[in-house]
Each structure stands twice: as structure tokens, then as C-alpha cells.
Amino acid sequence: MKIAAFTEGNYTGQIPRNHPNMRTDVAWWCALEATHHPFQHLPSIQDNEYDFGIVIIPKKRRYLIEVDIIGQLKRVCKKIAVMQESYYNYWQDDPIDEQIWYVNFLMDVDLILCHNDVDLTYYRGLTEKRCELMPTLMI
């Protein structure tokens, strides 16, 4: 299975096991042998390049609202998951148009990956979508 990770991080490629800054998200990319791409590279990736894509929507996302990010992700990946960023309801402090965009984004993905049981319950109730735990991973 070909897996991709998409974030605002400005790097492309797989993460080696000896990476000097193995944060939780990077550890998951390493364990899954996922190829990371920054959002701005999406237009240059071939159609159906990946079986599964995992996305982290950043806290500062105004620029993503301006583009068809979900359309690009669906073009590149057969299935899409979003990995929760921060605590479960941080996005509710955003301007209303960003809140609506975020909920619509959640509704358009196939799977939501959560940090803990509280977040899992919250996102299941909010979206009625499949939600799974993706706990901290240390390598």
C-alpha cells in the first residue's frame, strides 16, 4: 500500500528511522513508510498516486480555504484521513468561515484520526464518520 502524508511542512520524502526530530507525526510517517508532501506540491502529484493519504490541517489555514485542497487530495489518493491537530475543539475559536470550511473538510474525508478517547467521542458525535485512535508513537 502506498501511503502519503500531507502537511504544511516544507519537505518531501520518507522519514528515516534516525531522524533527529522524531515528533509524533513524523514517527507515524516513518512507521507507515509514508511519503511526505507539502500542500503546495499537490498539483504536481500524479492522479491516484497513493492508496491512502493522511492530512494534518494546520492551525493557520486561511490559505487552504482559497484552493480546492479536498479535490486535490481526492485526485491523488484513493482514501483520505485527517489527523487531528491540537485539542479537539481549538478550531471553534476561528472565524466562522474557517469553522464551516473545517467541518466541511471533515465531512469530505474517509477517516478521522484522533489523539485520545475524549477526542474520538467528540469527532464521532460531530461528524458521524469513522474515527480511530492514532496514539503517540515513539521510535
Each language-model region and where it sits:
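Polar, enzyme-active/binding microenvironments
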Residues: 1
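Short beta-strand->alpha-helix junction loop in the catalytic core
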Residues: 134-139
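Extended catalytic core of nucleotide-activated donor transferases of GT-like folds
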Residues: 4-128
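A short alpha->loop->secondary-structure connector
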Residues: 129-133
